[in-house]
Amino acid sequence: MTCCIDQDSLGQTFQDAIDILIQQSAGESQYSSENRNYMAIINPYPHVRGNANYYGMSPTENPLYDWRGVTNGSADLYLEGGFHQSVQNIAESQLVQPPFFQQKGGRGRRKLRLFEYLFESLCNSEMVSCIQWVDKARGIFQFISKNKETLAELWGQRKGNRKPMTYQKMARALRNYARTGEIIKIRRKLTYQFSEAVLQRLAPANYLGKDLFYPQYGQPDQGYLSLNHWNANHYAHGSYQS
């Protein structure tokens, strides 16, 4: 009887142990499942391992780069590109300079006046068949009779007129200059003279009897008088004497 009781007690003990093992096994299985789900959220690409040995380096080695290095490198590249762009803009702004006298006289700039155009033509060797100096030191010039209309047409184009300019209209403007004293009519056919004030402003060195270098006008369609920097500023800010 005692032997049977011991066997039953031993069997119950084994059964309890088996139940505990089964419960523990079930709990570990549940934990493993939850752990796998959690790891799946953290690392959605489980085939990419986070072990440093997988990348061929020891765990104590520093990474080849970090995000700060990448950010700083990008900033340096951006600043370098901006610097070159600024240099390029400065170079372009230096290459494209607005003319001192615009053809149609944009806002803030003067229109090219007739006596300025005549002086420019006198300084241009290509216009010698239309207009010539008679006495350069005194500012006396003369229109060439057979080509005076050509000169007038070119003046109209420089002004931007739609209708062709004629010498008759240009001569009318010259008579208006005679009233202000800027250009004086000489008692000689097609001959005029710049006033001293205008001549001083247009060519002060020439007026003083010194040799003045007149540059060749490579672009005749430019609507401005080619003077040196000092002459241009002096002329622009000076007042005319009547």
From Swiss-Prot:
Disulfide bonds: none annotated. The keyword Flavoprotein does not apply. It is found in: Nucleus. Expressed in lymphoid tissues, including spleen, bone marrow and thymus. According to PubMed:19037245, highly expressed in red pulp macrophages and, at lower, levels in B-cells, but not in other cells, including, monocytes, dendritic cells and other tissue macrophages. According to PubMed:10464163 expressed in pre- and mature B-cells but not in immature B-cells; according to PubMed:10187812 not expressed in pre- but predominantly in mature B-cells and at lower levels in macrophages. Keywords: DNA-binding, Nucleus, Transcription, Transcription regulation. One of its GO terms (molecular function) is DNA-binding transcription activator activity, RNA polymerase II-specific. Residues 112-195 bind DNA. Disruption phenotype: Cell-autonomous defect in the development of red pulp macrophages, but normal monocyte and other macrophage subsets. Mice show normal trapping of red blood cells in the spleen, but fail to phagocytose these cells efficiently and develop an iron overload localized selectively to splenic red pulp. GO terms for biological process: blastocyst development; positive regulation of transcription by RNA polymerase II. GO terms for cellular component: nucleus. PROSITE patterns: ETS_DOMAIN_2, ETS_DOMAIN_3. InterPro entries: Ets_dom (IPR000418), ETS_fam (IPR046328), WH-like_DNA-bd_sf (IPR036388), WH_DNA-bd_sf (IPR036390). Its main location: nucleus. Controls the development of red pulp macrophages required for red blood cells recycling and iron homeostasis. Transcription factor that binds to the PU-box, a purine-rich DNA sequence (5'-GAGGA[AT]-3') that can act as a lymphoid-specific enhancer. Regulates VCAM1 gene expression. Belongs to the ETS family. Binds DNA as a monomer. This is Transcription factor Spi-C. It comes from Mus musculus.
